[in-house]
Each structure stands twice: as C-alpha cells, then as structure tokens.
Amino acid sequence: MDEFHRCGKEDSFWQQCFLYPLFFQEDLYAISHDHYLDVSSSSRPMEHLSSNDQLSFLTVKRLIGQIRQQNHSIVLFVNCDPNPLADRKKSFYSESVLEALTLVLEVPFSIWSKSSVEGMNECKSFRSIHSIFPFLEDKFPHSNSILDARIPYSIHPEILVRTFRRWIRDAPSLHPLRSVLYDYRNSPENLQRSIIVVPRVNTRFFLFLLNYYVCECESILFSRLKRSSHSRSLSHGSFPQRTHFHRKIKHIIIFSRRNSLKSIWSLKDPKIHYVRYGERPIIAIKGDDLLVKKCRYYLLIFRQFYFHLWSEPYRVCSHQLSKNCSSSPGYFLRVRMNPLLVPTKTLDDFFIPILITNEMDPIVPIVPIIGLLATEKFCDISGRPISKLSWTSLTDDDILDRFDQIWRNLFHYYSGSFDRDGLYRIKYILLLSCAKTLACKHKSTIRVVRKELGPELFKKSFSKEREFDSLPFSSKAASQRERIWHSDIPQINPLANSWQKIQDLKIENLFDQ
C-alpha cells in the first residue's frame, strides 16, 4: 500500500483522478494472491494450494475485461459451476480481483488521512477508552427520551457507488465496484431482493464497505446539522473502535430538503446526545413528545432523501427514560479533553482513516468518593479509615468478600483514569477499614488480627488488581503507557444507595426552595 502513494502529496490529485490503471499493476495481484492463500490455507488441504492456485496475470486481465463488458445479468463472483475444480478456480481468480479492488479503493482514503493530519507534530498511541458508562451517567439523567435508530445495513448498489463518487473522481475505477455489487445482488440467495445485503464472505472487502457506509451516513448527517445551525456552536468528539463516538448537539435549526426556505422545525435550546456502539446509535433527547416525534421524523426523511432508502418506521423507535435509570451504578467521574490522533484499523489490518479526535482523560473524583465512604461509615469526613460496625456480626469471610466487592468494582471502573493516586488512596481507606472492622469484631488490634490470621489476610481480598496486571495484554511496560478499561462490573455498586439518597435529597431541597 505504501508503494502506491509513495509520491505523497504531489501526486494525490493524479491518484484520485486515475485509479483505474492500478488494476493492471502486477504487484497488486501478488499482494492479493498471498493474502487469499493465507486466508484459505486454514480451511483447504495443502495439496490444492500447490498445484492449482498459481496466479496467472493474463487470466486476471481477461477477468477484468469480462467485468467491464458484463450487463449485470451474469454472475461472476458466485460459485454456480457444477464442476468443483472450475468452480474453485473461478473463485480463486475472482477473490484475487476482489482483494485488489479493496486495495485500490483504500488509496484515496489514505491520501485523505495524510492531508487531514498535516501539521500535527506527533501521533500518540491509542488507548482503550471506557466512555459509554460515563456518557450515559452524565448525559442521560438530563434527558427524558431516547431514540434507538438502527443504521440500515442494506442499500442499493447504485446508491453505494454514488457515495464513492464524492471521494473518487475516476469513474472507470468504480465500474469494477459496481459490477461486484450487482453480482452479489444477482446471486441466487439475493436474487429476489432489490437491495444488497452485506454478506459475511470476503470480510476485508465488505467490512470496508460497511465501515465506509456508516461513516458516510454520520458525516452527512452531522454536516447537514452543522450547516443548518447557522454557524452556532456544535461541539462533538469521537471515540473509535469499541466505544466509537458520541456527539453533543446544541442550538440546531433543521430545514426541509424539499424546500430549504421553509423550516420543518426549530430547536431553541435542545439537548440532543448521540452515542453509537457498532450499528446501534442511541440518541438521548430532553424535550416533550412533539420534539421526540420531530427528531424521529427527521431521521426517516434524512435516510429517504440522501440515500433513497425507505427506512421502516420501526427501525427508529422511541422510549421514555426513567428518572432514576442511569443513577443506579452509583459512580462519579470527572474528565478532561486532550487532542489526540487515533490511527484505526480493523480486521486484516486494512486501511481506516486516522481520526483527529479528543482524548477523554478520566480523573478519579477523590473528594466525592471519600464523601460517600464517610456516609457509609468506612471513614470520617477527612478520609481517615474507621471500622464498619454494622458488619461486625458477619463472618470473617463475608466481611472480606464485601470489602473485596467494593474495591473490585471501583478498580474496574476507575482503572483507566489518568491519575491513579486517588484510586490507591481509596484502596488504602478500604484496606484499613476492613482491618479495623475485623479487629473490632475480635476485640483486638489490627496488628493482632494480622498476626492471628497470617500474612495471607489481605491476599484473599483486594486481589483483583493483581489479576488485572497479570492479564496477557497487560505487561508491565505496556501498563505504563496505556490504560486498559474493564467493563465487567457484575452487580450494582454497594455505594449506589447512598449516592441515590444524596441525589434525592438535593431534589427535595430544590422543591422546598
């Protein structure tokens, strides 16, 4: 891939305008041929690979000629030949061409990524960001409705090709893409459908199309909202890979596509929050039922006019949020945003553009957590550990398990924080509170309890940190550079009840005033 755009910025215009000659580069098919053999070698006997799967560049050229001359009524990329040898041979060359097509389509996106990061001095390593829970807990309490808007995974081949025309100016280079999409559409399993369904074959090619399609949907949607907002503030951030991104939209006025002079609806001061995990976007809205209906209607109209896709109404469904739905975990979080370059890649390491985004650096809110611990009688208001008298009637194992559960949940949630000093202070408070509780139960001192129970006392409890550090992806060197988040919190935080009481008390005080 680096060889194709080795000339850099000077040849970017030429490469965008003339991608079709790349299809006749012999090196390109050597790369795709090697990749195809690597993928298929695990599922096919080795003797088949040595004698029959020898790449002939002349055969590849003939296949490209057939692609250009076909009328979309024949199927080149589907195994229809009853002869297994001919069937496998056809599949071998068609898959090689498909791999080459994927490499060619990645070229303009790689050029775009180089221009987008121009002027940036450094590229920091990617950190796995645990942003979904903080986002939900911070934003959703201020919302009363959510829209579950599934991104359509089916689209007509011609619409998908037209979206590529926004990036690729060389029309002949899109002919193979159009032919491949129509061939899959005309396959026996998709023959009765008017739209193409992304299959699970040739993951590299179709995963590239799926990622491109999702990015195109969201880029058009939010650019449209930004233009319609009359240059008002539109803050947004992105979180790729697992958490992808969330966007916050304020002060938006949306106009009809049919008549740009006539406003469909106007939002004076709305609060709309957008978060996506995979293909499931969730939009949280603060407003009345009319506002929710307008947002739902706009999403349906947007898909219909920009992608000529009739989206069934049930794919954008609305739900009412409970007032207490997002406060049950009972965690606090403070964040700071830093600019970050995120190079992303997916299966088979094929190209995905580098994202210029904001890095979320969570910070452990030590003061609120100590306040909660003081409310639950684990420490005093200054953070000095005290015994948990209400637990002295329990067995030693139950006491250790309860303290261990609290620490495990807190560590899993805050282990990706920028500064762990506050987290270790919480561990110190819980550790000594556990020791003082056992000492109070046995009517002795901490030293006596530790001497009687042995040095293994605290190895049973507070052990999750060592388990975390021993994970295969958590080497000592890597842990100093990266932060790995856990999200396997098995139950509600025991401190959640106290946190909920504080929130209810604040609400009651507001009404009393």
UniProtKB/Swiss-Prot annotation:
One of its GO terms (cellular component) is chloroplast. It is found in: Plastid, Chloroplast. Keywords: Chloroplast, mRNA processing, Plastid, RNA-binding, tRNA processing. GO terms for molecular function: RNA binding. It comes from the Eukaryota. One of its GO terms (biological process) is mRNA processing. Pfam families: Intron_maturas2 (PF01348), MatK_N (PF01824). The keyword Chloroplast applies. Transmembrane segments: none annotated. Belongs to the intron maturase 2 family. MatK subfamily. PANTHER family: MATURASE K. Usually encoded in the trnK tRNA gene intron. Probably assists in splicing its own and other chloroplast group II introns. This is Maturase K. It comes from Pinus resinosa (Red pine).
